[in-house]
C-alpha cells in the first residue's frame, strides 16, 4: 500500500472517530441536562406539595399531592434524600401525632432540604449549622361550608 494512501486513510479514520466521539459526548451532555431538568421538576412538585400539608393550610387534596410527590421521588432521588424523606414522613405521620415535636420536624425538614439541595448542586454549599428553612402558611381564611 502506498504510504500517502495509508496516511490519508488514517486521517479519515481519525476524523470519523473524532466526529463520533464528539457526537456521543454531546448526546450524553444533552441527556444529563434532560435528567437534571426532570429531577428539578419533581423536586419542585415536592416542595409545592408541602404547601398542602402545612398546619393551617392542610387539605385532604394537599395530603394526596404530598403523597404522590414523595412517592415520585422514589424514582430518582439518591439514597441520602430518600433516607431524609422517610425520616421526615415518619415524623409528620398521623401515627406519630403523640410524639411529634416542632423541633424534630424542623430538624428533619432541614436535613431533607439539605440533601435535595446537595443533589441538585446548589452553590455555594449550604452551612448545615445555620441552615434553618421555615415553611410559611398563607394565612388566608378557609372557606368552610
What are these model-derived regions, one by one?
Residues 6, 17-145:
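Conserved non-transmembrane functional hotspots
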Amino acid at each position: 500500500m502506498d504510504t500517502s494512501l495509508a496516511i490519508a486513510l488514517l486521517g479519515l479514520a481519525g476524523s470519523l472517530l473524532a466526529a463520533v466521539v464528539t457526537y456521543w459526548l454531546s448526546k450524553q451532555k444533552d441527556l444529563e441536562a434532560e435528567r437534571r431538568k426532570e429531577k428539578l421538576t419533581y423536586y419542585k412538585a415536592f416542595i409545592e406539595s408541602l404547601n398542602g400539608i402545612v398546619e393551617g393550610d392542610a387539605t385532604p387534596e394537599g395530603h394526596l399531592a404530598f403523597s404522590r410527590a414523595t412517592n415520585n421521588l422514589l424514582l430518582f432521588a439518591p439514597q441520602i434524600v430518600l433516607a431524609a424523606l422517610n425520616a421526615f414522613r415518619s415524623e409528620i405521620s398521623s401515627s406519630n401525632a403523640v410524639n411529634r415535636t416542632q423541633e424534630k420536624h424542623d430538624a428533619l425538614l432541614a436535613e431533607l432540604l439539605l440533601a435535595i439541595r446537595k443533589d441538585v448542586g446548589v452553590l455555594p454549599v449550604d452551612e448545615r449549622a445555620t441552615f434553618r428553612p421555615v415553611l410559611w402558611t398563607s394565612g388566608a381564611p378557609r372557606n368552610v361550608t
